Amino acid sequence: MLLIANVATVAVPGDLGNQLEAKLDKPSVVHYICYKKTDSFFTLWLNVELLIPLAIDCWVDNMRLIYNRTTHSSSSPPGVEIRVPGFGRTYSVEYLDPSKRSVGMYFFNIVQAMVDWGYTRDDDVRGAPYDWRKAPNENKEYFLALQKMIEEMAHKAGGPVVIIAHSMGNLYTLYFLNQQPQAWKDRYIKDFISLGAPWGGVAKTLRVIISGDNNRIPVISSLKVRSQQRSAVSTTWLLPYANSWPKDKVFVQTPTTNYTVLDFKRLYTDIDFEDGWQMRQDTEPLVADFTPPGVAVHCLYGSGVATAEAYKYSEDFPDVEPTVVLGDGDGTVNLWSAVQCRRWVGRQKQPVTLLELPANEHVDMLVNYTTVAYIKKVLLSP
C-alpha cells in the first residue's frame, strides 16, 4: 500500500548506533601490530575484525577520548581523526557494519518497511548519525545540521517531520527539542516516536565505568575495554539521575560501601576516575530537569526482560566482575527509567502516549512487528 504523501522521517540512533570512521597518523602505537598511519578513512565502528585479541588494543587506543578539565571537552588522541559517515543518509544507521553482517543490523528493518510503504531512502527517510561517544554539549554542529535537515525535509514534503529515536538518541532528541522555540516545533515536528529511551539513566552504565563491560563477548576482557568506555563522556551522562530514581536505592554495593544516586562523587573518587565526576557535572544538567519536549510523544518501551539494576562487588572492587542484581526492563534500559516519560502527561498540551512492549529486548524492538505497525499508524495518521 502506497502513501499518498509521505510524512518525512528522521532516524536518530542510540549509543553505538551508527558507524564511525578513523584516519591515522599517530606518533606512536600501543602494540607493534597496530597501524600507525593510514592513507584513508577506515571503519572503526562496527568492524568485528578489530575486536579480536591483540587487535582490540589498537581499537581501544583509537576509539578513546582524552578529557580536558580546563575546556570541559574531549578529543581524540594525537594523530587520530574520527568522522561520522552518512549524515542525511540511512546506511550508517541501518547497518553498523558496512559489510551488512546481521550482527550489525540496526534500523534496517524499520527503513525497509518504510520503503515498502513508498518511502525513498535518503530523501523522505533519512538518518541523523552523530559521534555517540560524546554528550550533546560537545555536538553543537550536529544539532545545527539536524535543524537544517529537518527544515529542508519539511519544506520538500509540505508538512512537519516525524523523528524516530532509539535509546540514547531519545535524550539527544529531547535536548534538541528543548533548545527549539515552540513556534519552530509547531511548524516542523509532527511526532516524536521514542523507542527504548533511558529517560532516567540506566544502572548498566555503573558497571561500565567501574569494571568495564564486554557485552558478553567472551574473547574481550572487560578491564581491557574499560579505559575506552570510561573515556566516552556519554557513558557518564547516562548514569542514573537523582530526579528519576529513589534517593535511597543502592546501585552499587561493596564490602565497605553502598552507593546511591547521591554518592556518585565518592564513587568516582573510590574507583580513581576523578575526570568522570567532572564529566558528570558537565553533562547531568543537559536534560536533568526533564522539560517536556513540546511535541506529540509516543513512548514505546520493552518490559519483562531481566535487566541489571544493581551490582555487588567483592573486596577486589573495582577490578573485578560484579554479581548482577536483576530487575525489570528491556535487558538494557530499566523499566523505572523507561516510563519516566509519563511525567510529561498533563505538562504539555501535545499528547503523550505510552506503549509497553512485553518481552521486547532493547535492540530487538526495532524489528518487532508491533513497533513497525505502530510507526506505520503514526505516519499514516492525518
What are these regions (language model features)?
Residues M1-I164, M168-Q229, L239-P240, P246-P255, ...:
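N-terminal non-catalytic accessory region
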Residues V233-D316:
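Glycine-rich, aromatic-lined ligand/substrate-binding cores of catalytic
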